[in-house]
Amino acid sequence: MSRRHAAEKRVILPDMKYNSVLLSRFINNIMKEGKKALAEKIVYSAFDKIEKKHKADPYQTFSNAMNNVKPYLEVTSVRVGGANYQVPTPVDERRGYALASRWIITAATKRSEKMMIDKLAEELFEASNNRGVAIKKKEDTHKMAEANKAFSHFSPKKTKQGN
């Protein structure tokens, strides 16, 4: 791993249907073994299910779900004087959306419905209404950060630029 500079952020093209970079990242997270067409089919079919079953705008449901699941605090492990402390740190927007999509996909995978399309549609709809396993995961993360608020003065080290 090079110590000279951080890797460049890759430019992700927006998806074809809704012209959204966020949805494109979500599709990339769904994708397994490079099968992007299948991942797109799963997501767009789940969107159709949301539209038919719940009579709701699927993209609006998706963006509400992502915003509801996105955490604003998390704990990072910091070593101080031979002890590790769980220090609450704010989550930047990009990481927040990455965590949200990961949690939604994990929660959807563990659901009892038969097909991933149904699982994803239901989890997205529940998350948009502040229910479901993904929302529970966010709340647990925030509880951990709240419980370790006393260690917030041990903020993680900032890397020096230019050295």
From Swiss-Prot:
Cited Gene3D superfamilies: Ribosomal protein S7 domain
Matches recorded under InterPro entries: Ribosomal_uS7, Ribosomal_uS7_bac/org-type, Ribosomal_uS7_CS, Ribosomal_uS7_dom, Ribosomal_uS7_dom_sf
GO cellular component, one term: small ribosomal subunit
Superkingdom of origin organism: Bacteria
Entry-linked Pfam families: Ribosomal_S7
UniProt GO BP: translation
Gene Ontology molecular function: any one: rRNA binding
Listed transmembrane segments: none
Keywords in alphabetical order: Ribonucleoprotein, Ribosomal protein, RNA-binding, rRNA-binding, tRNA-binding
Quaternary structure note: Part of the 30S ribosomal subunit. Contacts proteins S9 and S11.
Role summary: One of the primary rRNA binding proteins, it binds directly to 16S rRNA where it nucleates assembly of the head domain of the 30S subunit. Is located at the subunit interface close to the decoding center, probably blocks exit of the E-site tRNA.
Family classification: Belongs to the universal ribosomal protein uS7 family.
Name this protein carries in UniProt: Small ribosomal subunit protein uS7
